[in-house]
From Swiss-Prot:
Pathway: Amino-acid biosynthesis; L-serine biosynthesis; L-serine from 3-phospho-D-glycerate: step 2/3; Cofactor biosynthesis; pyridoxine 5'-phosphate biosynthesis; pyridoxine 5'-phosphate from D-erythrose 4-phosphate: step 3/5
Pfam families from the UniProt entry: Aminotran_5 (PF00266)
SUPFAM superfamilies, per database record: PLP-dependent transferases
Subunit composition and interactions: Homodimer.
Main location: cytoplasm
Keyword Transferase appears in the UniProt entry: yes
Cellular component per GO, a single term: cytoplasm
Cofactor note: Binds 1 pyridoxal phosphate per subunit.
UniProt xrefs under HAMAP family: SerC_aminotrans_5
Protein name according to UniProt: Phosphoserine aminotransferase
Essential cofactor(s): pyridoxal 5'-phosphate
Amino acid sequence: MSKRAFNFCAGPAALPEAVLQRAQAELLDWQGRGLSVMEMSHRSDAYVAIAEKAEQDLRDLMAIPSDYKVLFLQGGASQQFAEIPLNLLPEGGVADYVDTGIWSRKSIEEARRFGNVNLAASAKPYDYFAISGQNDWQLSDNAAYLHYASNETIGGLQFDWVPELGDTPLVVDMSSDILSRAIDVSKFGLIYAGAQKNIGPSGLVVVIVRDDLLGKARSSCPTMLDYKIAADNGSMYNTPATFSWYLSGLVFEWLKEQGGVEVMEQRNRAKKELLYGFIDASEFYTNPIAENARSWMNVPFRLADERLDKAFLAGADARGLLNLKGHRSVGGMRASIYNAVGLDAVEALVAYMAEFEKEHG
């Protein structure tokens, strides 16, 4: 096999090589049973054991309290934009939302289809380069919940703090930074994350929801979108995304073997400090995000002359530095440096950036 490339894709994203090797080894014959996980009944004892271990490993990694359910659902994070108000926003009620970029705006637009949304805060006045402090937010007195995205994958804007709301449930989209650093799950009413960034392959969304928020779905909520029904059926009301669930479980095992979320946080800090440090010291590359709001996972940057973008990407591709093109709505470059992207990948990227600057700067 040729050398594996360094994959900076925002999602579907890099997976740990050890996980891919194990999945490859088990692909045709899972633990001597003579069949693939893809061929197993989700009701079989073997698969139920896989699913239960994945959940327990995630609980261990995140220290999830016992009064929270962990759901492995379908539809991706985008389906949660509707599922959350259908389950948590009563008819005639209001939900607070914070706008920090494209993904939080999508969640706001979807929630407005189901009820009243109060825009509690927006990064728009800062051109989405900074996040206002909570003292400047316009919170509702009786919000059913407050929703925000902890990390904006496209814009590279990340909260480095957790809102304090008293009794109002805090709902957070952690699709691109879950498991990247330690958090206190008990501060949140509901956490959700699409799998294809820091958890596993696409086709799966993980929802961590506090027990007291179950059973509140509207009568119009489809059965498949009701959290309580999902919880009561062990995330298997219908056939789940079995292979994605299995692979995510392998990632959780790998994370535990690496030392857990605390070790990931140390590694991720080193990666982001190296990359941002190089960008800030350069007169050729720029990142406009306020320092206290810079994403650890998704680092957008621009070249001094956008006419050089194609040459930069071609050179990166030739060196096995893949998927650095920025999102079409933002332009420029973006390096996504999730848990599975090692420090060696960031070192290789910085070396190339220095070489390109020397040649074209």
